[in-house]
């Protein structure tokens, strides 16, 4: 995966390629090769290898970028003036809408790559932690009755 600093240092062309790869991966990525991707994206193999040292690493970069995009979309849906329950609704609605475009082919291939599945699990755990913290805040403010928010 790309460190956030490295992501910020990407050229415009590299960002465009990663965006295009996200769209390509929607059709599934298990059978894609670096050479096939380079031909499809009209770029050199060297350009792809500058993004990641292997096909498997490139898969992780693209998946991680997609998951971060979903997370940013959800976080940006929260208005600082919202109460915790409204913020939770907005956050979960935005996250749900962001993942609604996930294709069966992408989900199938994601499940078949253990490292990509771990990335997905990590991002899901973060989403759950945000939801729990918003519920905890709602309990603290008296918006909802005291409950064990970790159980939800």
Task: Describe the predicted segments one by one.
Residues 61, 74-101:
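Hydrophobic alpha-helical connector segments
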Residues 93-130:
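Short secondary-structure transition hinges
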């Amino acid at each position: 995966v790309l460190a956030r600093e490295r992501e910020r240092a990407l050229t415009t062309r590299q960002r465009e390629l990663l965006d295009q790869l996200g769209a390509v991966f929607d059709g599934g990525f298990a059978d894609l090769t670096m050479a096939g991707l380079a031909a499809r994206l009209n770029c050199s193999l060297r350009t792809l290898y500058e993004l990641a040292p292997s096909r498997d690493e490139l898969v992780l970069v693209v998946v991680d970028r997609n998951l971060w995009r979903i997370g940013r979309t959800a976080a940006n849906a929260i208005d600082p003036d919202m109460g915790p329950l409204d913020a939770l609704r907005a956050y979960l609605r935005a996250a749900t809408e962001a993942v609604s475009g996930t294709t069966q082919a992408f989900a199938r291939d994601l499940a078949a790559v253990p490292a990509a599945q771990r990335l997905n699990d990590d991002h899901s755990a973060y989403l759950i932690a945000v939801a729990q913290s918003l519920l905890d805040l709602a309990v603290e403010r008296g918006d909802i009755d005291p409950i064990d928010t970790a159980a939800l």
